[in-house]
A protein has these predicted regions:
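Acidic, small/polar-enriched beta strand-loop surface segments
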Residues: 2-6, 11, 184, 214-356
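Oligomerization/assembly interface segments of phage tail-like spikes and tubes
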Residues: 28-49, 87-98, 189, 253, ...
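Short linear motifs in intrinsically disordered
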Residues: 45-60, 201, 238-243, 318-323
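Short intrinsically disordered coil segments
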Residues: 55-60, 106-112, 228-234, 268-270, ...
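Short beta-strand and beta-hairpin "edge-sheet" elements
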Residues: 64-94, 331-363
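Short, well-ordered strand-loop elements centered on a beta-strand within folded domains, enriched
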Residues: 89-95, 205-217, 260-264, 358-367
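Charged- and aromatic-enriched interaction segments used to assemble
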Residues: 94-243
Length: 370
């Protein structure tokens, strides 16, 4: 195991700075459809962590750090902040997709019937075309059958409940005067299409390659070959959510438009509980189809079923580090005093790894909720 520091040169290349950074308390986070990151500290001060010119190798938005375990890169991120406290230096690094956050669009873009994944690639092309803006991230060529953007027109329809809906639709646009956060634009596309994404870092000879993996409609697979079992590779009994505090058997989604012209969707399912309705407002939902998708997703998350949201696992033959990734579905087998024996398929949303101890904390949710 080792920690590596490089300098991102801004032209798509990077220069090695150190192959043995003495980091302590390291945690790497690999998110599904999120930036992830890396955090750690150095204490006491290490004089050798300098360039040939005597300058510190750690510079925010210039230095990249990687965790390598058994020759495989298990995490990589860009240094976004550092704080000195006496002899200790704390490092806070954001995953590569975090590079889009708060960055504005500086041109004009308008498309009709465009694949959202093409727009997602365009956002990265626009960002990495800037002087010193190329971080060497290659974006997948994945496509989808979804199309966004229409000729300008007044859209009218009647819902199944007999209500009239009217709103104006038009091209999908990006503009210097309104698009101020490319990261939010990218995530909005991922949610509405939908598609998943995550970043991988791999050795290619002596060069580190960065790839933004896109998956329509999602990434991951059901892993029948792996399992998490209490007493085998689960360190402690997972907390099981039994409350059902946000339970609803019906969801009302209100989207773009005002009053009777508002985009609307109602989705419900029969249950053995009392009828309850949850209301979700999201003005970014421009179509009935988008509102339907949002309502169904919200409904699945509110059915009040037994759920597990976090597990603490160790490296084990039943599920070794690197064998599973965010997006994968894995069976959890545990026991709870109130719920009894629990066997639950969950989807991995995030993996936070301690490379030193080879322990991981996984954020998960039952597969029916995503």
């Amino acid at each position: 195991m080792r920690y590596i520091a490089t300098r991102l040169n801004g032209d798509g290349t990077e220069t090695p700075l150190s192959f043995d950074v003495p980091l302590q308390g390291v945690r790497t986070t690999d998110d599904l459809s999120g930036p992830g990151g890396l955090e750690g500290s150095i204490s006491p001060e290490v004089q050798r962590l300098q360039t040939a010119g005597g300058e510190p190798i750690f510079h925010a938005w210039s230095t990249a750090l990687y965790a390598e375990v058994d020759g495989k890169l298990r995490g990589g991120a860009i240094l976004a902040g550092l704080k000195a406290q006496g002899p200790s230096l704390s490092l806070d690094c954001v995953g590569f997709t975090g590079y889009l956050k708060d960055e504005p669009y500086t041109a004009d873009y308008s498309r009709v019937a465009v694949d959202p994944l093409d727009v997602a690639r365009h956002l990265w092309e626009h960002r990495q075309a800037k002087t010193n803006g190329n971080i060497g991230l290659t974006v997948d060529t994945t496509t989808s059958p979804i199309r966004i953007g229409t000729p300008v027109k007044e859209t009218s329809f009647t819902t199944g409940a007999g209500e009239d809906v009217n709103f104006e639709s038009g091209p999908y646009t990006l503009a210097w005067w309104k698009t101020r956060d490319l990261g939010k634009e990218f995530d909005d596309l991922a949610t509405s299409t939908p598609f998943d994404y995550r970043v991988s870092h791999e050795w290619d000879g002596e060069t580190i390659r960065h790839r933004l993996i896109l998956g329509y409609p999602n990434l991951g697979a059901r892993r029948e070959d792996l399992r998490f079992v209490l007493g085998e590779n689960l360190f402690q009994r997972p907390t099981i959510d039994l409350t059902g505090g946000d339970y609803a058997s019906e969801v009302l989604v209100l989207g773009a438009g005002e009053g009777r012209k508002m985009v609307r969707s109602v989705q419900s399912t029969p249950t053995r509980r009392l009828h309850r309705t949850a209301v979700l407002e999201d003005k970014s939902l421009q179509s009935k189809a988008a509102a339907d998708r949002a309502a169904l997703l919200e409904l699945r998350s509110r059915l009040g079923e037994v759920d597990i949201t976090e597990v603490d696992v160790t490296n084990h033959p039943h599920a070794r580090i690197g064998e599973y990734s965010p997006g994968d579905e894995i069976l959890i087998q545990t026991r709870h005093d109130w719920a009894g024996e629990v066997s639950l398929w969950v989807r991995i949303l995030s993996i936070t790894l301690d490379p030193q101890t080879e322990r991981s904390v996984l954020s998960v949710t039952r597969v029916e909720r995503v």
